[in-house]
Amino acid sequence: MKQYDYLIVGAGLYGAVFAQEAKKAGKKCLVIDKRGHIAGNIYTEPVEGINVHRYGAHIFHTNNKAVWQYVNQFAEFNRYTNSPVANYHGEIYNLPFNMNTFNKMWGVVTPAEAKAKIEEQKAAAGITDPQNLEEQAISLVGTDIYEKLIKGYTGKQWGRPCTELPAFIIKRLPVRFTYDDNYFNALYQGIPNGGYTAMVEKMLDGTEVRLNVDYLADRDALNALAEKVVYTGPVDAYFGYRLGALQYRSVRFETEVLDTDNYQGNAVVNYTDAETPYTRIIEHKHFEFGTQPKTVISREYSAEWKKGDEPYYPVNDAKNGALYAEYKKLADAEKGVIFGGRLGEYKYYDMDKVIEAALDVAAKELK
């Protein structure tokens, strides 16, 4: 008999949900994380009384009622609605592209006028077979929106011009012909009052957690403690990169406290011109409607990823997809180990989908 039923590698959302379900099923778990904190990339920390999203903006949204009810056991959610704005050389546009955006851009008032304007620009460009992201975007929304709101921002995000990016990156661009600035088409949306860390803490309540523990550096000793392993770290690192490293995009943040109560009037402002080096500025207090005397902002920079950097977004292209498929075969053949989460499955996961996946796996595993 080993000391624990499950060793859970990673105290992020996937690991915490699995731990919670295992505890309910009477199992004993040990959760470890190589960072000095729980909650993975949804970690929030208080600065000047403001919950700061250390790894970028996280806005919970879902259409899955069961997942919504699940998270509400661990936190009370506020009514925050994601309505980012774009700043293009001092011109402010609402996102996602909607009637407010078109009115500002062209002075059009009705949906019919906006549609006509977009169609006119698409026709003028005459693109029938888009060869790259630039042509694809223009064929979907016309030249003006592309030039002001897509070109510079997307180029910064990917570290190369849109003419060098494949067309398939944007299969569609959400265009709305209503005056609605709600970014997500989700039934349920909000931010947990008091931040995400407190929510994950509640999920892990009653489960042993050890921080600053690097699983891959001490694998054999840690494996000896438990019957099974739930691994939520990078799948390629688990196998010693034996097939090569999967690629990611990384993000870098410059966070500062400002002596003003309101810096930009919105939680998220995207800088869509090519000249501004950062992609967006997050003003954290607006996620929880804060009235503190000071404010905390984070400038977000997109960065090429190299081994050792924080991996954020999987690069979903054919090459990395094929490499992950090979790693998945190795993972499926690994006895006594469950691979899950954003890094374990090399997948861009919204929070609700991570919870869904962890609940599904836990239900099968613990039945």
Language-model regions, residue ranges each:
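Short, well-ordered alpha-helix to beta-strand connector turns
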Residues: 4, 26, 207, 225-227, ...
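N-terminal Rossmann-like FAD-binding beta1-loop-alpha1 element of flavoenzymes
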Residues: 4-31, 362, 366
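Glycine-rich FAD pyrophosphate-binding loop
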Residues: 20-48
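Short catalytic/ligand-binding loop motif for oxyanion handling, primarily in non-cytosolic enzymes
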Residues: 39-41, 88, 94-95, 146, ...
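Dinucleotide-binding Rossmann-like beta1-alpha1 core, especially the glycine-rich loop
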Residues: 48-123
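Active-site/ligand-binding neighborhood in enzyme catalytic cores
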Residues: 89-93, 99-228, 232, 236-239
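Mid-domain catalytic core of redox enzymes
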Residues: 215-330
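C-terminal catalytic lobe of FAD-dependent flavoproteins
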Residues: 310-367
